[in-house]
Amino acid sequence: MRVYISGGITGVENYREKFNKVQEELEKDGHAVFNPALYADALPKLSYEEYMKVGLYFLSMCDAIYMLKGWQKSCGANSEYGYALATDKIILEE
């Protein structure tokens, strides 16, 4: 299954470690994982809106979304969650 990881990035300490740990766990279970924390630094010149468009594009190609603890505090993660609900993605939570 293709899984998109969603959670807070902006203003969150150690977000890379949190995303990467979940990626490793999901991959051990045989899933193909899209980790948006990996492209946060690769696309530094994008606006927030452009960054979200990229994330939603990748989420659109996934079967499921994995919501990290505390995702409710993130505007971006809330948008991704809403998109996942609207498009009938499987929703997994930490």
Protein language model regions, located:
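Conserved catalytic or regulatory cores that recognize and/or transform ribose-phosphate-containing ligands
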Residues: 1-94
